[in-house]
Amino acid sequence: MDPPRDIQHFKRNIASRSTVSSCSSLAMEIKRKKIRESMFFPSEDCDIKEKMEFEMRMRAGAYKLMVASTKKEQVLDASRSLLTCNARIKAYMSEAQKRTGHQDFRRPSDSQGQVPCKGKVAISGLRIPLFWKDSEHFNSKGNTQRVAVFCLMKIGSEIFDTEMVIADSSMTDICFEGVKIFSEVKPDFELTFELYICGLDEEATFANTPKKLARKLRSSFGRSSGRKLCPLLDGGDPDTFLQSNPIPPGARYSLLAYTTLGLEQAEGSFQSHSLIILQNVEASSWLPLYGNLCCQLVAQPDCMTLDMMSGFLSQQQSIEGLQRRCRLYCVLKAGKISCYYSPEEIQAKVEPILIIPINKETRIRVVENDHQRPGSRLNLINPGNGDSASHVFIAESPDVLQEWLDSLWQHIYDQSQWQHTCDKLMEIDVLSPRKPPLFLTKQADSVYNDLSIGSPGKFESLTDIIHNKIEETNGRFLIGQEEETEPPHWAALFEGSRPIVVQKTVLSPGKESNRSITSPDTGSKKKRRAPPPPPDKLPFTSVSTNQEKENCKGPKPRAGRPSLDAKFSAIIQQLQKSHTSTRKNAPLGQIETGQQPEKRAEESDLPEYTKKEYIVDPQPPVPAPRNKLRMSFREKMNPKAW
């Protein structure tokens, strides 16, 4: 039989320090937490080791590329990658040492402290103004010193670099495009900005003496001893790597200027910051800096972008002395509690029915339970200019109430640490804003918008467009007739409000006969072609005198064509000219003044005032015979035959 276990019971005293028995359940929970922490930190260490191995491989590849490159720009770009990889390796090594030290001295009481939430920091629109002399900037003839410039930005172990930019005296400022976003940033962050420079006109001569010496040392030792020596020569330490793999002087970058930005500089707009310029650097004379850095620094705390707490709460309302409860889905985010009827309203982007601000002025109280009103109640009071607004919520259980209390106090603490960045959410632009163009160019699809076609995106051939237009107008489009305008408003003539030009219509037997001939008759058969006119008679020319006299004072109203007719008017005129050129017409002449046609008996009986409105026309002209070699309509519309 097992001996009975020694069980000790302790009572917690608030005044004295509480002790925990090794056999109690709380002690077992603490042990489990330590085991979880010991399992968690090796995974973080493995993550850092993987990052270090990746940067080491990138560094080796960058050095090989630098040695194999023949162009100076490629050598400088590879040297930039090599410098960035070394900086990241140093940051990972220091981060691993910090985590190892924190793991050794970690205590359970340390986790009880209040820690602010993390966030994101983005920097964009980097612009460095230059201060050239007038003689160097305006009188440069291509003999100026060119330099390669790039930037490094660091927050903790996160390091970003920019692209390499070639600068000369013709540039007024150096611009770097793109946005660099740092994640998992604390509110007391320090963003270090460094500007590196290298001359482009210097020759890069590689000195491989240390590498040759290392190879001789490896070959002089045995195979086993050489393997042990290889990690020492090609270790992860950046200084050791640069000793065995030196960078040529012509491709070696130098730190020219630096600055440090913090939470106070995160305004969300473009600001100018001072740069600390190193005067003892030889390259400081190559690039005259104005001494400022223009950029946009944005900070986004997690409490402004993530839901810090969410769940159902019952709001207690008093309507005309009656108490009622309304169950609402509440979300704590961005300094306020948004209340909805259901979580689906958030996905549907429905406006919340109630918004309660949460800030340092908000008073949070817990109302004690009573027999008449069971349940844990939470009272939120926001004092204002007048009456203070009070909202009472009832939680489902004391545990839920405690979670909401912890989240509310944590949210207020996060706002106090992130300061002005919690007043309004700062947006992070995906692309850095660029300079606007000097001249605004026209859009490429504006030509299709000018055409009066039903669908601008529909690609049709010229023949199809004209054929469809002819079918819509029943052939009037090809003949060139104007569209009929609306009849004039005769009521306006008697009112006298608008001037109207009245025009008489001159009728002649020749025109009536021509209309009867040219009018389509679907029921009759095809008529026989008329014979050519005799050579001794001249063709007919109509003369209208009364019409010209009546219309000489007022302009003749012209019906407007649609935009498509205006587009293809030149094409139709060309088609009509080609059509008339194929006919064999007789030479035209003019009617002599002495030759007057005989008047008909019917016209002699008309009164004098009717004779003024009519003009007696001679015999109508006889059309010329058509050419036998007549082209079809599709042959005329073919652009190859033009």
UniProtKB/Swiss-Prot annotation:
Signal sequence bounds: none
Ranges where the PH domain occurs: 306-413
Transmembrane segments: none
Classification via InterPro entries: AHD, Cytokinesis/Rho-signaling, HR1_rho-bd, PH-like_dom_sf, PH_domain
Keyword Transport annotated: no
Coiled coil: none
Protein name: Rhotekin-2
Source organism per UniProt: Danio rerio (Zebrafish)
